[in-house]
Amino acid sequence: MTTSDVAHRAVLFCKQDCKPCTLTKEFVFAIKPRLTEYLSIVQKENHPALVAAYDLELYPTLLVVDEYGHELQKIVGGKNVREQLVNILNTIRYNRNT
């Protein structure tokens, strides 16, 4: 997986044995399928090159990525991610449809 694979999306980065990551993924699955077509979930251990490309150290981290794979916004921490995720996905959906 490369930065172009996650272009124009929100990308949730998680890692194993991370309780906030688990809670955040459960939240994501609860809103499926309404907005998750605009979201990719990436497991840190499975995609080290992508994690390195975005210089990630804390999890969960939600990135909003433009059509070129460039980071537009970074939100760190499960509670912060859950509070802002639906609004971010709605914004991406709106921008794709205009």
Write out the residue ranges for each language-model feature.
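Local sequence-structure signature of Cys/Sec-based thiol-disulfide redox active-site neighborhoods
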Residues: 1-33
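Thiol-based oxidoreductase modules, predominantly thioredoxin-like and allied folds used
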Residues: 13-14, 36-49
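Chalcogenol-based redox active-site neighborhoods
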Residues: 26, 53-54
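Secondary-structure boundary motif
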Residues: 30-37, 94
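Short beta->alpha connector loops
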Residues: 43-46, 60, 79
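Structural micro-motif
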Residues: 54-64
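Non-catalytic, surface beta->alpha helical segment in thiol-disulfide oxidoreductase systems
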Residues: 65-98
